[in-house]
A protein has these predicted regions:
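Active-site histidine-anchored catalytic micro-motif
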Residues: 1-33, 66, 72-175, 180
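Metal-dependent C-N hydrolase catalytic cores
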Residues: 28-95, 272-285, 291, 295, ...
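Short, surface-exposed amphipathic charged segments that create phosphate/polyanion-binding patches used
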Residues: 57-64, 142-145, 183, 257
Length: 302
């Protein structure tokens, strides 16, 4: 949200929530609390409480029991809209045809439901940008990233929808992290910056214990990069598909990273048609850009 706030050419039109790091109720409450903290008035609607098939994840504590542990947030000063997130997505896309970028930083269930509810949505959207997947090591499993793994059917539907799509996975976002020293520097700011520091400290501690990492990965802000400053991440137009059936690989994102020539051998499977712009390399400017956006939002929220 800080990056959106700092980008003068973008306008936050709506916020939707989905199950994931915690229950839908907790995630929605967190969104409303953060809106109050940052003085954001965008409408908020709760969405899916579980994936398209089966039940949602249980006992997800990487962000604590509330889904956003580590800081004391203000009590929400409003309730979510009395409509489902899918309806808010459709209303917003219908009102801003050809302009709306749908940024998905959690499970893709709401997006898949919206696309299946209104087939015209794919033509109304300017783009979809996703934080999810990995071309290497996963986090939920050895090869699957959490946001895709919790609802691979939804992810598969979204990637096949034909909407211009940008994807940034763990192999990139894990290289976009803040150190303990950078987190400490945020404490020199106001309430919002100090709250972000508290949240990042908690997350860094969790990542150290669970994954042995020494930086707090800034996963979600990376999804917004192509529409804020395309030079902050290098992308490749290629194919990404979701594994739905593998016993060990369900939820894995399979990306075409080969450089096949014009000569094909019978034992080599040809490339699928490109369907996404896949993040490959973050710029050294990205972390300073995100920290500067947090500081700017902190000043405006004071």
């Amino acid at each position: 949200m800080a990056m959106l706030y700092a980008a003068r050419h973008l306008d936050l039109r709506a916020i939707t929530t989905v199950y994931g790091n915690q229950t839908l109720e907790k995630v929605t409450r967190n969104a409303l609390a953060l809106c109050r903290l940052a003085r954001l008035d965008a409408p908020v609607a709760a969405g899916a409480a579980k994936p398209l098939l089966g039940e949602g994840p249980k006992d997800v504590t990487i962000h604590g029991k509330t889904g956003i542990d580590g800081a004391e947030l203000p009590e929400p000063d409003r309730a979510p809209l009395d409509i489902h997130a899918v309806e808010l997505i459709l209303r917003t896309a219908r009102a801003h045809r050809g302009e709306l970028v749908l940024a998905a930083t959690g499970a893709l269930t709401n997006v898949a439901l919206a696309l299946s509810t209104e087939p015209k949505l794919k033509d109304w959207l300017r783009a979809i940008t996703i934080m999810g997947g990995s071309t290497g090591i996963g986090n939920s499993t050895e090869v699957a990233e959490f946001n895709i793994h919790v609802d691979p059917e939804a992810a598969d539907m979204v990637l096949r929808a034909g909407v211009p799509t940008w994807v940034v996975g763990l192999d990139v976002t894990r290289r976009v992290g803040v150190t303990a020293e950078q987190i400490a520097s945020l404490r020199e700011g106001g309430r919002l910056a100090r709250t972000m520091a508290d949240l990042l400290d908690f997350f860094l501690d969790s990542l150290r214990r669970v994954h042995g990492l020494n930086t707090a990965s800034l996963h979600d802000p990376c999804a917004l990069v192509p529409f804020i400053d395309p030079g902050l991440i290098e992308y490749r137009h290629t194919s990404v598909r979701v594994e739905l059936a593998g016993t060990l690989t369900r939820g894995m994102t399979v990306a075409e990273l080969r450089r096949l020539g014009s000569t094909q051998l019978g034992h080599i499977r040809p490339s699928a048609a490109p369907n996404v712009h896949l993040a490959r390399e973050p710029s050294p400017r990205l972390v300073p850009h995100i920290l500067a956006a947090i500081r700017e939002m902190d000043v405006r929220a004071t």
